[in-house]
Design a protein with these regions (language model features):
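A conserved beta-strand->alpha-helix junction
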Residues: 121-129, 296-309, 403-408, 434-447
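Generic beta-strand/beta-sheet core signal
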Residues: 94, 161, 169-170, 181, ...
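PRPP-dependent phosphoribosyltransferase catalytic core
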Residues: 164-165, 200-206, 356-465
Length: 465
């Protein structure tokens, strides 16, 4: 994943830009960047943040940069923001999304006269550079952003910094949020709504799907109105959104309480304590405990000072190491106890296997696993939130292949009342060593959001676009 933040202010914007961008650090662990526009023109800094946090890497830039307009990003892929000089003028650009037809668009750009694209390490082309090339096909920034989004198969939200303000475009299907905040003399635009709260901003608006606005210190001007159809990523609430954020009027923490509540209403397990796997599983566990009456406990504590999210690193051994080292057991709360552990999801199963062994090794009598979303059956074609190289890395798909063959019809396994679904769960439970296993039902999860199912993307669970 990635996240971005932008500021337009009548005063220097660097303070707000620095901290607003930093508040997106949970969305990526590879690179951070900031670009500002002021009296000296455009300034930009990009740093690798794999081994040090954003604030540490950008301290010097924070002291040296100045300007009234700025954009920043936390990126889990390409370096950005990029500085661009084109017939549209000079600008800086940052993006959040995924381009599935990148090679096709690059070849089309060559046919249209583009001479080259800079290659990143690993042989990949910077997707943000390609987006800039697509924007440059337009006669204006706004028209170019529209053309870029129409050409892209996948999803793409964009911030473009110019001397006239920040142009903000939300993905055409609204898969990721773009939110505008305001305070006296300044407006900001952000992925995470909580990122501006401690900076003194209040909520102004959410851009609708495909909407393009120009943000200035005076306000947000709509250049292209929103489309009606929306498919916002449901996994925002389940896992990778910050608990303090609100999307489409629904707070992440509250939605997780609702998920836990719904899980408990369909469960009848006896346990000595309910625990959430930190951090995203914690709120789900609160909802479960409140509904079930089973005490909420913390049998392990997350050491937050230095360990990042284990979901992010590309290397499996690195992910497993982080998942293990960041959790410190409290043996007196584990030994001889029947524990019910809730996590947001189960992707490959390696980390939950390690956590279960960790609890049994610390003396747990039983370990019951509850997941706050349905089995993940498909890789996401819209956002880079999963590091699985293929769908056969997904533990649910591996078990389906074992039961019915690699090319089996998946449909029966999406029905939580079917015998095929029950067989898949038993295969997963047995391999990972859980005492019992239950997933959140898709219908219950959708109900937990309070939003219409037609507005939510559920592709990774049921394959429906």
């Amino acid at each position: 994943m990635s996240g971005f933040f932008g500021v337009t202010s009548k005063k220097d914007c660097v303070f707000d830009l620095f901290y607003g961008t930093d508040y997106h650090s949970h969305l990526g662990t590879r690179r951070g960047g900031m670009a500002v526009y002021g009296k000296s023109g455009f300034e930009r800094a990009i740093h690798n943040i794999e081994n040090a946090p954003f604030r540490t890497k950008f301290e010097r830039d924070f002291d040296e940069m100045e300007g009234n307009y700025g954009i920043g990003c936390i990126s889990d892929s390409e370096p950005q923001p990029l500085l661009v000089r084109s017939h549209l003028g000079n600008y800086a650009i940052t993006t959040v999304g995924r381009i599935n037809n990148l090679d096709e668009l690059v070849q089309q750009a060559f046919r249209d006269g583009a001479s080259h694209f800079l290659e990143m390490s690993g042989g990949n082309i910077n997707a943000t550079e390609l987006v800039a090339a697509l924007i440059n096909r337009g006669s204006t920034i706004a028209e170019g952003m529209r053309l870029a989004q129409e050409a892209i198969d996948g999803s793409m939200s964009i911030l473009v910094l110019t001397q006239d303000g920040i142009y903000a475009a939300r993905d055409r299907m609204g898969r990721t949020p773009v939110i505008v905040g305001k305070k006296e003399g300044a407006y900001c635009v952000t992925f995470e709504s909580f990122a501006y709260l401690n900076l003194g901003y209040t909520f102004e608006k959410s851009l609708g799907p495909g909407e393009i606005d120009r943000i200035t210190p005076e306000g947000a001007e709509v250049l292209l109105p929103a489309r009606d159809e929306m498919k916002i990523c449901t996994f925002l609430w389940v896992y990778y959104g910050n608990p303090a954020s609100t999307y489409e009027g629904l707070n992440v923490e509250e939605m997780r309480y609702h998920c836990g509540d719904a899980l408990a209403r369909r469960d009848n397990i006896e346990a000595d304590g309910v625990a959430g796997l930190p951090d995203s599983g914690t709120a789900h566990a609160v909802g479960y405990a409140n509904r079930s009456g089973i005490p909420l406990v913390r049998p392990f504590i997350k050491y937050t000072a230095t360990w990042p999210r284990s979901f992010m690193p590309t290397n499996q051994k690195r992910r497993d190491l982080i998942a293990h080292m960041k959790l410190i057991p409290i043996r007196s709360l584990i030994e001889n106890k029947r524990l019910l552990l809730i996590d947001d999801s189960l992707v490959r199963g390696t980390q939950m296997y390690g956590t279960t062994n960790f609890l049994f090794g610390s003396g747990a009598k039983e370990v019951h696993i509850r997941l706050a979303c349905p089995p993940i059956l498909y890789g996401c074609p819209y956002l880079n939130f999963s590091r699985s190289a293929s769908e056969m890395e997904l533990i649910a798909r591996r078990k389906i292949a074992k039961l019915s063959g690699e090319h089996a019809d998946i449909t029966p396994y999406t029905d939580p009342d079917s015998p095929e679904y029950a067989a898949m769960l038993e295969e997963i439970r047995s391999e990972l060593g859980f005492t019992s296993l239950r997933y959140h039902r898709l219908d219950d999860m959708i109900a937990s959001t309070g939003l219409s199912s037609c507005k939510l993307c559920t592709y990774c669970w049921n394959g429906k676009k």
